[in-house]
Amino acid sequence: MPGIKVREGDAFDEAYRRFKKQTDRNLVVTECRARRFFESKTEKRKKQKISAKKKVLKRLYMLRRYESRL
């Protein structure tokens, strides 16, 4: 769990920025959003398949775009 120590003379904005950076690195917010509602194994697999297809299509698009420049 992220946590910071506020130093003397630290402004609130600076401490908040450091805390926010730590939470972003540890994926706390995204994990909370993912666990907000129960998700069955089949739903997880379905989402993984969809994301895998998106990655493949993105790679193909980038590859074709790169090849067209040659």
UniProtKB/Swiss-Prot annotation:
Family affiliation: Belongs to the bacterial ribosomal protein bS21 family.
GO BP, one annotated term: translation
Name of the protein this chain belongs to: Small ribosomal subunit protein bS21
Record's GO cellular component terms: ribonucleoprotein complex; ribosome
InterPro entries hit by this protein: Ribosomal_bS21, Ribosomal_bS21_CS, Ribosomal_bS21_sf
Keywords recorded for this protein, A-Z: Ribonucleoprotein, Ribosomal protein
Any one Pfam family match given in the protein's UniProt record, by short name: Ribosomal_S21
Recorded GO MF terms: structural constituent of ribosome
Superkingdom of the source species: Bacteria
